[in-house]
């Protein structure tokens, strides 16, 4: 992990947090800058910066952080945060301090961001567990491929990858020998085992391997490395595939992990979880400058949806009273054709 852009994209800059937090530690008239004939107060600074994109994002993150800390604060330990912090530091190596500095972060502000992320992660996983229906299990089973044994070549250059693929296609080519010679992985590792739910192998590589029969060799697979932002190129050969059992319950534990992992990556699902937490916290925006920071979560929370549905029902009832003939026509139409909900109810639920 040698590129500091990942930090920039994933955390709030220290400067933006300071722009907002300054108002908490001092009053509006506190002078933060003085000069000949003029001063700049906290209020001046706040009004100047609050409409900027970075401050809008900072406020959103601050709200989410406070809400999830209040609701799930006891679910994430200091040890977990420290572990994640040191793992990131190890991945960046010697460039970690520079990456933090470039993002205007200190170790402590970065740890706070890690904690906030983990609190949301916990809430999302807990919500995902409630989605574990028989239908979800069966759906996951349909696309599931059990453990595969593969040989994989990892390369840094597309032209080299294409050349290696041609070499592999030659009659009598020894995939294992060529793989060990050409791969750029540490210690020349080429043998792997994983199933279709693996997260330690690039998704496109997993998909390609899952689609192959035993002995099959993939084309060159191009993958953008999310840590280095550099492209990697893969060629895989499936050497063995476990036979898939007919009963999905044989894989229930594994399917559970896959379903939860997929929902945890689903931004729409994440937003619903955040929206529900915001609803529960009864968040109210007091400054119009920040009126739209929660727009992406509007109408996603359970309370918000219920209020919206209640409002719609009330408006429909009022309209029916004002237009009785139209209401009667609607009722007649509804009696002739089942609603979507009724149509679904008429069929037995999947078991």
Swiss-Prot record:
Residue ranges of the region described as Disordered:
303-351
| Lipid-substituted positions (S-diacylglycerol cysteine) | 23
What is the catalytic activity of this protein? [protein]-peptidylproline (omega=180) = [protein]-peptidylproline (omega=0)
User: What ranges does the record list as Low complexity composition bias?
Assistant: 303-317, 326-351
Residues in domain PpiC?
Answer: 145-240
A GO molecular function term, named singly, is:
peptidyl-prolyl cis-trans isomerase activity
- Keyword terms of this UniProt record: Cell membrane, Isomerase, Lipoprotein, Membrane, Palmitate, Rotamase, Signal
Might you give the EC number(s) for this enzyme? 5.2.1.8
**Cellular component annotations (GO), alphabetically ordered:** plasma membrane
Q: Which InterPro entries match?
A: Foldase_PrsA, PPIase_dom_sf, PPIase_PpiC, PrsA_foldase, Trigger_fact/SurA_dom_sf
- Gene Ontology biological process terms, A to Z: protein folding
Its predominant location is membrane
Tell me what topology the record assigns in the membrane.
Lipid-anchor
Q: Which Gene3D superfamilies match?
A: 3.10.50.40
Q: Where is the lipid attached (N-palmitoyl cysteine)?
A: 23
Q: Where in the cell is it found?
A: Cell membrane
Q: Which family does it belong to?
A: Belongs to the PrsA family.
Family matches, as NCBIfam families: PRK01326.1, PRK12450.1
What protein does this entry describe? Answer: Foldase protein PrsA 1
Q: Which organism is it from?
A: Streptococcus pyogenes serotype M1
